[in-house]
Amino acid sequence: MYIQILGSAAGGGFPQWNCNCANCKGYRDGSLRATARTQSSIALSDDGVHWILCNASPDIRAQLQAFAPMQPARALRDTGINAIVLLDSQIDHTTGLLSLREGCPHQVWCTDMVHQDLTTGFPLFNMLSHWNGGLQWNLIELEGSFVIPACPNLRFTPFPLRSAAPPYSPHRFDPHPGDNLGLLVEDIRTGGKLFYAPGLGQVDDKLLAMMHGADCLLVDGTLWEDDEMQRRGVGTRTGREMGHLAQNGPGGMLEVLDGFPRQRKVLIHINNTNPILDEDSPERAEVQRRGVEVAFDGMSIEL
């Protein structure tokens, strides 16, 4: 299985266009040793030719331009994208679909709850129906596994995550299973397994068991501290309120990942306020000391 990190930042990217927190300001004035990042999205393939896009970032055009296999140039109009999987209906995971309209129709896999959001509060399915068939919906059931024909050697097992629907959603304050998903992706030839959960607010025994069975854990790296947004003066909500488990402290993501010495561990969906973006920070050193990697745009993983 080929895993390509197209974007590794949380919503807004890094540096965020309107932010002057220590990280964003430091990156712009050159006082911070850090790497710019686009908003999170990954691509998966079983042959390096046919790719499944997981979430469609607002930065999708730049991400595809930076990854040559996404333009195989076999025809006058071409793309390496053969299917799209949406883990939720958040704006920073779906807006990129608008930029892919010239390539419609697209096969899109998502839950019923995500499809409801994308036909009501943010009606992308309706809007894009005017472009050559638009988005062709394939239902993700919450029980069992599924295979996408373009990559027949990859088996996807979805699992619901506890998190809120987007602010625009008609059921924002009435959460349902299927609003947010993680994925366990297995290459049935090699046996390699990826646990992918860019929005992970709580880890229960069922998830721990799935993580133990995986070879690579690509998980939520949004915040270092639960009250980071408040400390930095850029927000009022905690990480847990937003559905993100912070890295630091008792019960934090790093403590969870300490229990997986065999697995490759990678943090993704990193917010612009997170001090691990500063490559010289003690927080970054602590992450590395504990055997955890920080995802970056263009990172490649094979399982």
Curated annotation (Swiss-Prot):
InterPro entries registered for this protein in UniProt? Metallo-B-lactamas, PQQ_synth_PqqB, RibonucZ/Hydroxyglut_hydro
Cross-referenced Gene3D superfamilies: Ribonuclease Z/Hydroxyacylglutathione hydrolase-like
Keyword terms of this UniProt record: PQQ biosynthesis, Transport
SS bond list: none
Pfam families for this protein:
Lactamase_B_2
Q: Pathway it belongs to?
A: Cofactor biosynthesis; pyrroloquinoline quinone biosynthesis
Which is a GO BP term held by this UniProt record? pyrroloquinoline quinone biosynthetic process
Biological role stated in the UniProt entry: May be involved in the transport of PQQ or its precursor to the periplasm.
Assigned protein family: Belongs to the PqqB family.
Listed name of the protein? Coenzyme PQQ synthesis protein B
Organism in which the protein naturally occurs: Pseudomonas putida (strain W619)
Which gene name belongs to this protein? pqqB
